[in-house]
Regions:
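Alpha/beta-hydrolase active-site loop
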Residues: 1-12, 19
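Stable alpha-helical elements in mature extracytoplasmic
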Residues: 1-4, 27, 118, 122
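Extracellular/periplasmic catalytic domains that process cell-envelope and extracellular macromolecules
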Residues: 13-14, 38-40, 79-84, 135
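Conserved alpha/beta-hydrolase "nucleophile elbow" surrounding the catalytic nucleophile
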Residues: 23-25
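Catalytic metal-binding/acid-base residues of hydrolase active sites
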Residues: 27-29, 51, 94-95, 148
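Short glycine-enriched nucleophile-adjacent loop
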Residues: 28-39
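The feature captures the conserved acid-bearing segment of alpha/beta-hydrolase catalytic domains
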Residues: 43-131
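C-terminal catalytic histidine-bearing segment of alpha/beta-hydrolase fold enzymes
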Residues: 103, 123-167
Length: 167
């Protein structure tokens, strides 16, 4: 990712060009994991309606948390950086259906029964951990009313500006 950004900045002749990373569903899942492990200069990372989340805990195995990872990928410093990342969980309040492609493994169901529940639970868990440890918390949670698992509707909703820019 950093080389791609460098290339675009070089091609545009704008070495300080700001950028934002936005993904829906599996794209959101990818960006949550990117926020956890890859330092970025992104102004904001927006994960819209991911099917599962990466809870900032070693009590849940990787894929759903940081458990069973080597210490260099799961230390308190890694968790602290993850919680400080400019991550927005952008959730449609209508994304409550349990579809065949939604991860229904026991580890996923521990996060919540659907995408909305999982996003809310992960945000609350992360916010409480940051508060308890006195760590910077760079995450935001933005909900858009009534929208289900639909990228076009999510990104056309007025709340998308708040998800990306905080407005």
């Amino acid at each position: 990712m950093p080389r791609l950004v460098e290339r675009i900045r070089a091609d545009e002749g704008r070495p300080a060009l700001p950028y934002y990373l936005i993904g829906h569903s599996a794209g959101g899942q990818f960006l949550v994991r990117l926020a956890a492990f890859l330092p970025t200069e992104a102004g904001r990372i927006v994960a819209a309606n991911p099917g599962s989340h990466l809870f900032p805990t070693r009590e849940r195995d990787f894929g759903y948390g940081f458990g069973a990872l080597p210490v260099e990928l799961s230390s308190d410093e890694v968790l602290r950086r993850y919680l400080a990342a400019p991550l927005t969980l952008y959730l449609g309040t209508g994304d409550t259906l349990v579809e065949a492609n939604l991860d229904q493994s026991p580890a996923a169901m521990l996060q919540g029964g659907n995408r909305l529940e999982r996003g809310r639970a992960c945000f609350a868990f992360a916010a409480e951990l940051a508060r308890a440890r006195g760590w910077t918390f760079g995450w935001r949670k933005v909900e858009t009313p009534g929208i289900g698992h639909d990228a076009a509707e999510m990104f056309a909703a007025p709340e998308v500006a708040a998800a990306i820019f905080g407005r």
